Amino acid sequence: MNRQSWLLNLSLLKTHPAFRAVFLARFISIVSLGLLGVAVPVQIQMMTHSTWQVGLSVTLTGGAMFIGLMVGGVLADRYERKKVILLARGTCGIGFIGLCVNALLPEPSLLAIYLLGLWDGFFASLGVTALLAATPALVGRENLMQAGAITMLTVRLGSVISPMLGGILLASGGVAWNYGLAAAGTFITLLPLLTLPRLPVPPQPRENPFLALLAAFRFLLACPLIGGIALLGGLVTMASAVRVLYPALAMSWQMSAAQIGLLYAAIPLGAAIGALTSGQLAHSVRPGLIMLVSTVGSFLAVGLFAIMPVWIAGVICLALFGWLSAISSLLQYTLLQTQTPENMLGRMNGLWTAQNVTGDAIGAALLGGLGAMMTPVASASVSGFGLVIIGLLLLLVLGELRRFRQTSPVSDAG
């Protein structure tokens, strides 16, 4: 990255063929999973006319993902990571084929959809953990900030494209097309992933998988730096659950259907801008302090969002939250990867990703509870300002993270 530029440099895709292969595979995978994410709720709703059944499928898949992240973390620290990645992707694709075949039946099975959702949630997240653990070896720890920013852009771009494509396919060909293309896309990702070099794990004694996972929890609690990073990540994810209040807040602002879409687009847009303007972030001497301040700032943006007098100001607050949370997330990712021992990378990445899954669910549940006692405006504001207070307390308590200095700021090869 050019030291004089705030803009993200994409040269890592040119100089590191292995990372380029991962970038391509991840983008195709995100689009494929997006097609699945559109098709499953629509098919269940059409079959059952029950939003509860749709919610059950999401809950079951989320539970399978959580277990997959835990198991994947242990496997990524025990077995050659390339094999784990390929096995997880291939097995996940088999589940997509099953969904496609089921959708083509005269009477599709609801039980099959639930079971295959569990299958795909487990194996998809298992591969994600191994891929995250392998990233430092693919790009070098000095390039992790740049790699994280490029990955964030990939996720945001894929998350925008896949629902649009999924909706078009549903309108023109039905859910079977979504499942079929998701399966094809998943198997296509195996082609670039096959070009990856071997990714062996450091030699370490064999131990019971549960004891290995317990060792990761002990490390997390014993290391204030890594523990603080994980805690901040969970709180930021909880704050992003404010989206469950968008429909109710849109009514108070008298927004049209088209304008409501801007609320949902604001945070991803802000996050994309944060990734694009992260050029100097890798050279910060006090990344921990920047992480803490940007996290508190993002909570403040959520607190101000709902009390804005006009919806445009609310959208700006959400975009600001997206930008600040992207800065915090990039620093979390980089410090986690650089400060975690190699033999713990799989399990720590699994735990860090799992707190994103659970943090979102906890945040949505808390906002739902607040919504039962107060207005949507009050719910969003109380949650945001409450998190500001917690963030300020953590700014004081997490001294090791606040004082952490990079003796030689991360540089990149670009």
From Swiss-Prot:
Q: Which InterPro entries match?
A: Enterobactin_exp_EntS, MFS_dom, MFS_trans_sf, TM_effector
Compartment annotation? Cell inner membrane
Indicate whether Isomerase appears among the record's keywords.
no
What GO cellular component term, any one, is given?
A: plasma membrane
Topology with respect to the bilayer: Multi-pass membrane protein
Is the keyword Cell membrane in the record? yes
Which ranges sit in the Periplasmic compartment? Answer: 43-55, 105-109, 178, 240-256, 308-313, 378
Residues crossing the lipid bilayer are 22-42, 56-76, 84-104, 110-130, 157-177, 179-199, 219-239, 257-277, 288-307, 314-336, 357-377, 379-399
Primary localization: membrane
* Any one Gene Ontology molecular-function term assigned to this protein's record: enterobactin transmembrane transporter activity
Q: Which domain of life is it from?
A: Bacteria
What keywords tag this UniProt record?
Answer: Cell inner membrane, Cell membrane, Membrane, Transmembrane, Transmembrane helix, Transport
Give me the Cytoplasmic side stretches, as residue ranges: 1-21, 77-83, 131-156, 200-218, 278-287, 337-356, 400-414
- Task of the protein: Component of an export pathway for enterobactin.
Which family does the similarity line name?
Belongs to the major facilitator superfamily. EntS (TC 2.A.1.38) family.
Give the protein's recorded name: Enterobactin exporter EntS
Organism of provenance = Salmonella paratyphi A (strain ATCC 9150 / SARB42)
